[in-house]
Amino acid sequence: MQVKGVGQHHLRIGAAQLLSADALDRGCCSYGHEARGVDHAVGRMEASRTGLGMGTAMQQFELEWSSSAQHPKAVQLSPYGEAQDGSRTQALMLSWWPDLAGSWIFYTTLPLWPGITPRFERIARFAPVIGLFIGGAQAALWLLGRQLGLPSTSCALLVLTLGLWLSGGLHLDGVMDTGDGLAAGPRRLAAMADSRIGASGLVAGLMVLLLKVGALLALAVLAPTLLIWSAVWGRVAPLLAIAWFPYLRAEVSGGFHRQHRQPLLQELLPAAAVLGLLIGLSLSPPATRTVLAGLCGVIPTLLVPRLIGKRLGGHTGDSYGACVEWTEAFSLWSGWLMLRLLS
């Protein structure tokens, strides 16, 4: 078994002295003897174990050493860093908050929540929750605009502007960069990394916006509901891209999504909770067809990341953003098509 320190964690020795996690590379039994007379130490360590036919499994442990014990006491931690005991569910829920706060900071332009330190390694799984918020804000603005007598075209433009403001244009920028890359052939990665927008990228961005405006006008009174569904589906699509395809620019910071990912089913848990909430809120018979229209968004959610990934040979941070925007647009249209079939 190979034992190493976890990230930037340190080992607390006595009341004040700290031993760097780098020193833990020498093993879990030796570090106590290097404590220079301090008789107690507690810290976190990570063990990588190779099982038969199962590859390498990463586990976290909390170690406690004292001079009276021959070996450190190890308590296995869950993948989220909390002890695996009867309170695991509660600990798991509490450990989600820093990731959700990190997702809030990364995917929106809104300020950080007070009292929570964000964590960014696994923020992608909470993107659908952010989508629920953004889609809900857009739906509320649509309803307010209609209540004030604004025409549908004005409402459509307003809600798209709100979405761009809340996201900082992060995903639309990915659409344009990916459009340039897809048109550049073998130089696609260089074209996507270029901060200048080419003709293909500009056309791709306009296409996405026009598709959304057209779909919202076609949906009319059901536009607010489908706005929420599409915003959630759009942020599920990158999770599939992360799971299915390699990251093409590992040296770029966007690769941390894939580096820190867990099995796909675990990554989809927040999305499943959001989708279950949307279904539960629409179970009354008059809204059944709306639920079916919303669920149609699963089709572009499955297709868009696969099609883009096959064209590029993998994904980048830009193509993750493109997956969000194209999936949103096609989710709106697939919902409209389902409503037409049911009418």
Predicted regions, residues:
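Hydrophobic alpha-helical transmembrane segments
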Residues: 59-65, 71, 77-168, 186-189, ...
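Low-complexity, intrinsically disordered Ser/Thr/Pro- and acidic-rich segments
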Residues: 50-56, 88
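Short polybasic linear motifs
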Residues: 49, 74
